[in-house]
């Protein structure tokens, strides 16, 4: 696992302060780190978010994307019966996890495998924003 220190980029990145603020705000959300998640760089233009959602059925999960905000919600069905635990180490609470997406990041799909929710993202750069070669006369 790699951890990246982005602080040196603050000095040399002009106009990207909003991006860094989004990253910091995402880390400081008041949800206590539940559920835990990973963000993986698959390749230059593809990302994958993996969220640990053990105990949630596919029908109890909701994923929405609007503008640059990805929201993942998990809500257990109301029909769960009361249980008496001697020890409860597995969290069964409902959750809402928000991810601020950078511009041109699109959600391509999601699947639930062995208690992990995978959300695939792709960076799509419009033709107008791609670098173009300028001829010198």
Curated annotation (Swiss-Prot):
Inducing stimuli: By heat shock.
Keyword list, A-Z: Chaperone, Cytoplasm, Stress response
GO biological process: negative regulation of translation; protein stabilization; response to heat
Subcellular localization: Cytoplasm
Entry annotated with the keyword Cytoplasm: yes
Database matches in InterPro entries: A-crystallin/Hsp20_dom, ACD_IbpA/B, HSP20-like_chaperone, HSP20_IbpA
Domain named sHSP: residues: 28-137
Chain's role: Associates with aggregated proteins, together with IbpB, to stabilize and protect them from irreversible denaturation and extensive proteolysis during heat shock and oxidative stress. Aggregated proteins bound to the IbpAB complex are more efficiently refolded and reactivated by the ATP-dependent chaperone systems ClpB and DnaK/DnaJ/GrpE. Its activity is ATP-independent.
Family note: Belongs to the small heat shock protein (HSP20) family.
Subunit description: Monomer. Forms homomultimers of about 100-150 subunits at optimal growth temperatures. Conformation changes to monomers at high temperatures or high ionic concentrations.
Name assigned to this protein: Small heat shock protein IbpA
Species of origin: Escherichia coli (strain K12)
Gene label: ibpA
């Amino acid at each position: 696992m790699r951890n990246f220190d982005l602080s040196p980029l603050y000095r040399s990145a002009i106009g990207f302060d909003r991006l860094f603020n989004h990253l910091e705000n995402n880390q400081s959300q008041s949800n206590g780190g539940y559920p835990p998640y990973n963000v993986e760089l698959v390749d230059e233009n593809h990302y994958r978010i993996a969220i640990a959602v053990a105990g949630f059925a596919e029908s109890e999960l909701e994923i929405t994307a609007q503008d640059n905000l990805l929201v993942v919600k998990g809500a257990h069905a109301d029909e769960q019966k009361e249980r008496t635990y001697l020890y409860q180490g597995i969290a069964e609470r409902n959750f809402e996890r928000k991810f601020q997406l950078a511009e041109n990041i699109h959600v391509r799909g999601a699947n639930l495998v062995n208690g992990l929710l995978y959300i695939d993202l792709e960076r799509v750069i419009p033709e107008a924003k791609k670098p173009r070669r300028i001829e010198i006369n």
